[in-house]
């Protein structure tokens, strides 16, 4: 089953996540089909905290991808900010 979830990046004590579409059986940071955005939980000042490609997310959801709990919250936040 396809899932949209966070893949950890960044460095020590500076987490950074990529929103990726992947098979649910793959490891968290393993191979993925597509990267559809990013999330920076410790963004400061003018840094972008959340960026989501809404068109691609809509496509993947239409073909059956399921978002993780945290990604669902982030997508809701992103849609609210875009409106």
UniProtKB/Swiss-Prot annotation:
GO terms for biological process: translation. SUPFAM superfamilies: Ribosomal protein S16 (SSF54565). Keywords: Ribonucleoprotein, Ribosomal protein. Pfam families: Ribosomal_S16. GO terms for molecular function: structural constituent of ribosome. One of its GO terms (cellular component) is cytoplasm. The keyword Acetylation does not apply. InterPro entries: Ribosomal_bS16, Ribosomal_bS16_dom_sf. Coiled coil: none annotated. Belongs to the bacterial ribosomal protein bS16 family. This is Small ribosomal subunit protein bS16. It comes from Pseudomonas fluorescens (strain ATCC BAA-477 / NRRL B-23932 / Pf-5).
